[in-house]
Amino acid sequence: MPKAVIFDLDGTLVHSLPGLTDALNKTLAEDDLAPLDEAAVKRMVGEGAGLLVARAFAAYGLGRADDADDTATQARLARFLAHYAPDPLAGASVYPGALALLGALAARGIRLGVCTNKPEGPARALLEGLGLADPIMDVVGGDTLAQRKPDPAPLRALLDSLGVEADQALMVGDSPTDVATAKAAGVPVVVMSYGYSREPVASLGALAVFDDFASLGDWLGFPQPGGDRLGATPALSENPA
């Protein structure tokens, strides 16, 4: 049984795509650019707000999709955050079963954290507003350190904060970024199938792929009575018990 479980936020605990899409489209509209639909934005998220903005404008031939640090992208990022940060709860919802599993884990003394590329302020506001903050012991966001995922530094900082070693923790994410981060930090990792991955989740090399939190709870040894179970696809036969 892991001593700590560390979750990604967007696409793992929380469906935040509507609010991200709305803020991004407001930013695009300021430059007289057409709005993007949620399917397009979904393919752009996962590596921080800077790259989200860079990818959105690159779709219109403005800047490079892989460069979040140039002057123009930084200015666009500031405008995006001005739209998003005041109300990160807009259109956001908790994935079914997430709160129940967090509560069950915390009740058994499992230390919980969130490691996200979302800026720390909006991330904490989102957790608080959606009722997820109480069991979460710490949050490391995309601007907490100089590095962000897939660099292992944010995850390692969270391990230190929670007081656990890498092999005593489990990372739960939804994307190649989460898997790469966990592997670089030496943390076992599983992924949720419903999130914002741009690649097939079965190909990411995680220990297991879960379709819902009830199935993840079963695997962890915390079954949720009455929870909807869509299934799990283990990549390995063992569980962390």
Curated annotation (Swiss-Prot):
Key words, A-Z: Calvin cycle, Carbohydrate metabolism, Hydrolase, Magnesium, Metal-binding, Photosynthesis
Pathway of action: Organic acid metabolism; glycolate biosynthesis; glycolate from 2-phosphoglycolate: step 1/1
One Gene Ontology MF term: phosphoglycolate phosphatase activity
Residues the record marks as active site: 8 (nucleophile)
Residues binding Mg(2+): 8, 10, 174
Domain of life of the source: Bacteria
Known catalytic reactions: 2-phosphoglycolate + H2O = glycolate + phosphate
E.C. code: 3.1.3.18
SUPFAM superfamilies, per the entry: HAD-like
Cofactors demanded by this protein: Mg(2+)
CC terms in the record's Gene Ontology section: cytosol
Gene Ontology BP, a term: DNA repair
Reported function: Specifically catalyzes the dephosphorylation of 2-phosphoglycolate. Is involved in the dissimilation of the intracellular 2-phosphoglycolate formed during the DNA repair of 3'-phosphoglycolate ends, a major class of DNA lesions induced by oxidative stress.
Family annotation (HAMAP family): GPH_hydrolase_bact
Protein name in UniProt: Phosphoglycolate phosphatase
Organism field: Rhodospirillum rubrum (strain ATCC 11170 / ATH 1.1.1 / DSM 467 / LMG 4362 / NCIMB 8255 / S1)
Gene for this chain: cbbZ
